[in-house]
């Protein structure tokens, strides 16, 4: 047993020299590259404990190599975390490509979306959400996806979904409605895309209200995209819609999206590319 302990202590206090290393005038081993010591002397009282007068020290080369290894490991863990967040956070893999880097820069609200992300801690503390409203194809969903991607790159969990999927999940959920909604509300940011497109049954409207009301009570920000107009939201057709819209407008700052229909432009560009391929 004593021999085993001595062997462990020997490994702990020994330094393995490289061919270019050398012994300095102080008797310590030095790195042949950076000329810094790879050993240091124990204090006299410690030397008696370990049976040696010196222990390994980190030269500049070793320090640089260690820092590079640590940085690579930190980067790997970060990428793994972001990958898991995006796997859980997006309901459509295509949303991963909805990033500020891929944005064409033509949407006038892109600056607002970027600033929201930059000031996320303030937005979260003050519970400030956004309601992106406007015509079809004006980039509402895309910019919401950009915000989600940017926040997840900062390792902030975000969930982007829509009520069509939520209602289907609730109908098929084995964990129970309350637990499912609670899970949605645990995300620091929840994004509800294409609001107003879900079926308007009494059951559907009740579940929509339950989700939005639960999010309201959680005190966490909500971002909503919708093709409904602000007038539609402020003048609902009935009580069921009124209490839903009232909650939304109390949680989210309305942001209007105007301009060209980017989807039509994309479709036109694809058509022109296809024609060119066919005719060439």
Predicted feature descriptions by range:
Residues 1-104, 267-280:
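A short, basic N-terminal segment
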Residues 194-195:
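Walker B catalytic acidic pair
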Residues 124-144:
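Walker A/P-loop nucleotide-binding motif
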Residues 127-131, 158, 189, 221:
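Residue-level preference for the first positions of well-ordered beta-strands
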Residues 88-91, 96-130:
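Pre-Walker A (pre-P-loop) alpha-helix and adjacent loop at the N terminus of AAA/AAA+ ATPase modules
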Residues 108-117, 148-189, 199-206:
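Short glycine-rich substrate-engagement loop in P-loop NTPases that contacts/grips substrate
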């Amino acid at each position: 047993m004593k021999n085993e302990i001595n062997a462990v202590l020997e490994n702990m206090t020994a330094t393995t020299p490289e061919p270019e290393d050398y012994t300095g005038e102080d008797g310590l081993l030095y790195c042949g590259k950076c000329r810094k010591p790879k050993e240091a002397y124990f204090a006299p009282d410690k030397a008696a404990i370990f049976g040696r007068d010196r222990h390994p020290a980190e030269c500049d080369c070793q320090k640089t190599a260690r820092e590079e290894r640590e940085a690579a490991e930190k980067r790997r863990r970060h990428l793994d975390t972001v990958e898991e967040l995006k796997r859980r956070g997006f309901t459509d893999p295509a949303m991963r490509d909805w990033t500020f880097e891929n944005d064409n820069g033509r949407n006038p609200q892109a600056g607002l979306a970027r600033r929201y992300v930059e000031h996320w801690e303030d937005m979260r503390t003050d519970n400030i959400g956004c309601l992106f409203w406007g015509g079809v194809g004006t980039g509402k969903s895309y910019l919401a996806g950009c915000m989600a991607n940017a926040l997840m790159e900062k390792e902030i969990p975000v969930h982007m979904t829509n009520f069509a999927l939520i209602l289907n999940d609730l109908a098929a959920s084995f964990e129970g409605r309350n637990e499912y909604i609670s899970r949605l509300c645990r995300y620091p940011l929840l994004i509800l895309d294409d609001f107003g497109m879900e079926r308007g049954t009494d059951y559907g409207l009740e579940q929509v209200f339950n989700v939005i009301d639960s999010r309201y009570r959680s005190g966490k920000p909500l971002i909503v995209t919708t093709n409904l107009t602000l007038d539609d939201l402020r003048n609902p057709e009935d009580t069921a819609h009124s209490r839903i819209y009232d909650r939304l407008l109390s949680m989210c700052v309305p942001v209007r999206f105007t301009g060209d229909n980017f989807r039509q432009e994309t479709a036109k560009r694809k058509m022109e590319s296809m024609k060119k391929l066919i005719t060439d």
